[in-house]
A protein has these predicted regions:
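N-terminal targeting pre-sequences for secretion and organelle import
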Residues: 61-105, 129
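Residue-level detector of conserved, well-ordered beta-strand and adjacent loop positions
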Residues: 10, 36, 76, 91, ...
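Gly/Pro-biased beta-strand-loop elements
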Residues: 1-44, 57-69
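Short, structured beta-strand/loop micro-motifs enriched in basic residues and often containing a Trp
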Residues: 50-57
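Short acidic, glycine/proline-rich loop/turn micro-motifs
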Residues: 38, 45-47, 85-88
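Short acidic, glycine/serine/threonine-rich helix-capping segments at coil-helix boundaries
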Residues: 90-100, 104-153
Length: 157
C-alpha cells in the first residue's frame, strides 16, 4: 500500500520508461516509493502500483517543475490511517506505515526508543514483548488483535 505520513522529495528524474515521463522519490525509510507518471493512464485510480502515486504524464510534468528536492509531501489515509485495509498481524520483518504507527505508540508508552522508521526489527520486537508482558498479554513479540487493542488501535466500523 501507499505509505502514509510526512515525507520529503529526495530525488527527481526524467525517466520515460514504465514510470512515465517524470519521477520524484519520497523519503520513505522502508522502501522505494515516489510520485510518477505512467505509460498506462487507464490504471490511475486503481490498485495497480506497489504503493507509488501515479499521475497522468501531463500533470506530473507540471508538478515536477513546481516541486524542489526537500519539498514536504503529506500523504493521508482513510479514517483508519495506516490501518485502512485492516489490522494484520505484524512480525519481525514487517515494514510499512502500520509498523511506524506501532513504533510511535510503543514510544509514547515508554517501551520503544529506537528510530520511528516503519521497519519491524529486533528492537521493535523487544519493545512489543516488553509491552505485552506489562499488559498481561502473551509475550510473542508479534502484534496481534490483543496487542492492537491494548495500544488503543481500534478500527472504525
Amino acid at each position: 500500500p501507499t505509505p502514509i505520513g510526512l515525507f520529503t522529495i529526495t530525488q527527481k528524474d526524467a525517466w520515460g520508461e514504465g514510470f512515465g515521463s517524470r519521477w520524484m522519490r519520497l523519503s520513505v525509510p522502508w522502501g522505494v516509493y515516489g510520485i510518477h507518471g505512467t505509460n498506462k493512464p487507464w490504471s490511475i485510480g486503481s490498485f495497480e502500483s506497489g504503493g507509488c502515486i501515479r499521475m497522468h504524464n501531463i500533470h506530473v510534468e507540471q508538478v515536477y517543475e513546481w516541486v524542489k528536492i526537500g519539498t514536504k509531501v503529506f500523504i493521508v489515509g482513510g479514517v483508519d490511517g495506516p490501518f485502512t485495509f485492516g489490522l494484520y498481524p505484524l512480525t519481525q520483518g514487517s515494514k510499512g506505515s502500520d509498523v511506524m504507527e506501532i513504533q510511535k505508540r510503543l514510544s509514547g508508552h515508554g517501551f520503544y526508543n529506537g528510530p520511528i522508521d516503519g521497519i519491524y526489527g529486533y528492537n521493535t520486537r523487544e519493545a512489543v514483548i516488553a509491552f505485552q508482558k506489562a499488559h498481561g498479554l502473551n509475550p510473542s513479540g508479534n502484534v496481534d488483535t490483543f496487542t492492537y487493542e491494548k495500544l488503543g488501535i481500534i478500527l472504525f466500523e
